[in-house]
A protein has these predicted regions:
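Extreme N-terminal tail/first-helix region
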Residues: 7-14
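Short, Lys/Arg-enriched N-terminal segments with co-localized hydrophobic residues
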Residues: 1-6
């Protein structure tokens, strides 16, 4: 169809969720990261929850390996498992050392309901879907962190130098991280070039749900250390 040729899959997904994605930048937690005003208790609790999120996120890639129809896609998913465990989690490990978070504390910290709902949904999509559906769920998270970090730097150029939160900001705008997102995007475009309108609508549904879960995750993070939230 003519409209299909005019807009790639990723552009379509981003257009469908532009209001949700715009809301990320206004989240109090993200604003706190940007200006360095975030309560460290909230950030500490966020690091613990995000650690557990990443463990399940990695499992989504592992299901992708099992669902792969080509060696190329299999290698892509496998590469990301390593990239997440060696890359993103290393950012967390640094903060864990700073905050004195032990494996024992991690093991005894309950996973918050919003976090569990998000990863359960992603795992469900992965088990039910194929390569493109899995990539769609993954890309929502992976790319949103880059977009958020870039916007932070655009609005507060000194943010990457902040003694506490600068490392977080820098981690999501590194050439490795942003380069990996380009690879994900290109593969998603290739896998969906012959998708029907019905298939594309389903991807839109997945991407929208994951984007809403991302927004909820930032809201959850802002509740940490407050009454009714997780005490750091």
């Amino acid at each position: 169809p003519e409209g299909r040729q005019m807009m790639g899959t990723v552009d379509r997904l981003l257009k469908a969720t532009e209001d949700i994605w715009a809301s990320y930048h206004e989240k109090p937690f993200v604003q706190g990261l940007k200006y360095g005003t975030l309560d460290q208790k909230k950030f500490r609790s966020y690091i613990i929850q995000d650690y557990w999120y990443l463990m399940d996120y990695t499992k989504v890639f592992a299901i992708g390996v099992a669902k792969s129809k080509s060696v190329e896609v299999m290698k892509l998913f496998a590469k990301y498992i390593q990239a997440i465990l060696d890359g993103e989690v290393n950012v967390h490990n640094g903060y864990m050392a700073d905050f004195g978070i032990t494996q024992e504390e991690l093991d005894h910290t309950p996973i918050q309901q919003d976090n569990r709902s998000y990863t359960s949904y992603m795992l469900s999509v992965a088990y039910r879907g194929g390569e493109a559906e899995i990539l769609t769920a993954i890309f929502s998270c992976a790319y949103s962190y880059e977009v958020i970090a870039r916007k932070i730097v655009e609005e507060c150029p000194s943010a990457p130098e902040h003694p506490m939160y600068g490392r977080w900001v820098r981690g999501y705008i590194t050439p490795r991280y942003t380069g990996n997102n380009v690879i994900l995007k290109d593969m998603l475009e290739r896998l969906t070039k012959d998708y029907t309108e019905e298939q594309l609508r389903y991807l839109e549904e997945i991407f929208t749900a994951c984007s809403r879960y991302e927004a909820s995750f930032w809201d959850m993070a802002d509740r940490f250390g407050t009454e009714g939230g997780v005490q750091a």
